Regions:
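Hydrophobic beta-strand segments of well-ordered beta-sheets in folded domains
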Residues: 5, 96-100
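Secondary-structure boundary/capping motif
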Residues: 15, 79-80, 108-112, 142
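Charged helix-capping and loop-helix junction motifs
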Residues: 83-87, 112-118, 146-147
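Short, glycine-/small-residue-rich phosphate/pyrophosphate-handling segment
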Residues: 99-137
Length: 169
């Protein structure tokens, strides 16, 4: 049986989670939502956010049977979330193909992308693709997003993931 894509994401306001919800059936993926980091050691609570998300116990076990791994996180003040960075400090991505989806107000976030890419590469991944997703449109607030906004962004990411999946055949 071929490996399935896995989306690992963090969502504080629900914008990233909504994109993931739309994306899941498009790429036939599973998803895991990262909880808030706890304690000084940055331990993670990874739990259910919807019926499609499965509860998992620890970061090392979750990626073995999946490929590619899609990492999605909001960008705040030009930086990826601390939750995603802390998660990447505790996971083995050796030889995994990784697609990074950054959700933010800007069309690009090179500083955030560079930090996330470096952290993923430190964990051994084969870095494949990135996509910048608009979580907020210029002059608007994240609460102004409509269904078509989420669909447009999910489609952008689905195209990137589909290209990675097609490349492996």
């Amino acid at each position: 049986m071929a490996a399935r894509p896995l989306i690992i994401y963090y969502s504080k306001t629900g914008t990233t989670a909504k994109i993931v919800e739309i994306l899941l059936p498009m790429i036939k993926a599973e998803s895991r939502r990262l909880g808030e980091p706890r304690g000084l050691m940055g331990k993670l609570s990874i739990g259910q956010s919807s019926r499609k998300d499965k509860e998992i116990k620890g970061p090392d076990v979750l990626v073995d049977e999946y490929d590619p791994i899609i990492l999605m996180t909001p960008v705040w003040k030009g930086e990826p979330t601390a939750t995603m960075i802390e998660f990447l400090e505790n996971i083995d991505l050796k030889e995994k193909r990784v697609v990074v989806g950054l959700v933010g107000a800007n069309e690009t976030n090179p500083k955030a992308l560079d930090r996330l890419r470096r952290k993923a590469m430190e964990r051994g991944c084969k870095f494949i693709e990135t996509v910048f997703l608009r979580g907020v449109l210029p002059g608007r607030d994240w609460t102004d997003l409509k269904e078509e906004d989420y669909l447009r962004e999910a489609n952008k990411l689905a195209e990137k993931v589909s290209a990675v999946l097609e490349f492996s055949r």
